[in-house]
Amino acid sequence: MSAFTPASEVLLRHSDDFEQSRILFAGDLQDDLPARLDTAASRAHTQQFQHWQVLSRQMGDNARFSLVATADDVADCDTLIYYWPKNKPEAQFQLMNLLSLLPVGTDIFVVGENRSGVRSAEQMLADYAPLNKVDSARRCGLYFGRLEKQPVFDADKFWGEYSVDGLTVKTLPGVFSRDGLDVGSQLLLSTLTPHTKGKVLDVGCGAGVLSVAFARHSPKIRLTLCDVSAPAVEASRATLAANGVEGEVFASNVFSEVKGRFDMIISNPPFHDGMQTSLDAAQTLIRGAVRHLNSGGELRIVANAFLPYPDVLDETFGFHEVIAQTGRFKVYRAIMTRQAKKG
């Protein structure tokens, strides 16, 4: 996270304007500009655990990770720099949360890639902080306004839910497959054997649908779920509770906070990080799985058929199987044997 994103490069064109400002950085913080920009004071709030990991090393307690920002997170700030995410409901949640806490008169900057839909910030904030475009470069837009009225923020109003085969799935903005079960997860679910036992880890759990569906036909499994996203962690907890399923849920950057070994690791790993395609998480998942599987345990993942996972699976486990596939997706299985590299 040393190279700056295009959005940060646009902000750097205005770095002189920020030297006397007490800035809160928030939104899609994909680099460490919040820790490096010359300001009077800097804070950062993120819903992404992996971004908090990087920023907290340099900013300490001034970098915060949570679903909802609190008054302490924005204390003494007179400027908000908000990085627009690719997901508009996510931006709505975060901006309404932050603007409900910041004092009237706060300088508001919104920056983002044009293809992410950053233009819609003008309409979203029209009643609270009317924005004007002040720069356009690197296929990004930078908008500025001043907070004129605090919105009323109620996190409960952002919850959604849907049903899958009689199961209730709770969701929040920014959670993968917020509006329904994706095709890849459906394919992975179709391969899970009823009456499975043992410890199961769901990495990148999203709204928790894989785990609750698995637990319904295999009630003796012991579930652990993790995700980098604070909305996903909270959504998974709510999904488990809504279906009467027990499990431990926590934030983790793939295996960073995971302890112990499991009989099965399941995942529909992400390959988009913000607006960029990224295979890092899935490759970290495959290579790290051998340190968290019991002997004879298995890794089972679903992925777009075009992604180059077979080589990483073979390199790590010695072999792999494709146990289900469609034109777009494949479900891979790899077993922890003596052939597997022990990490």
From Swiss-Prot:
Enzyme class, first EC level, given as a word: transferase
Keywords: Cytoplasm, Methyltransferase, rRNA processing, S-adenosyl-L-methionine, Transferase
Listed InterPro entries: DNA_methylase_N6_adenine_CS, Mtase_sm_N, rRNA_ssu_MeTfrase_C, RsmC/RlmG, SAM-dependent_MTases_sf, Small_mtfrase_dom
Pfam families in the cross-refs: MTS (PF05175), MTS_N (PF08468)
Catalysed reaction, written as an equation: guanosine(1207) in 16S rRNA + S-adenosyl-L-methionine = N(2)-methylguanosine(1207) in 16S rRNA + S-adenosyl-L-homocysteine + H(+)
A molecular function GO annotation: 16S rRNA (guanine(1207)-N(2))-methyltransferase activity
GO cellular component terms attached to this protein's record: cytoplasm
Family according to the record: Belongs to the methyltransferase superfamily. RsmC family.
HAMAP family: 16SrRNA_methyltr_C
Oligomer and partners: Monomer.
Functional note: Specifically methylates the guanine in position 1207 of 16S rRNA in the 30S particle.
Protein name stated in the entry: Ribosomal RNA small subunit methyltransferase C
Source organism: Escherichia coli O157:H7
This protein's encoding gene: rsmC
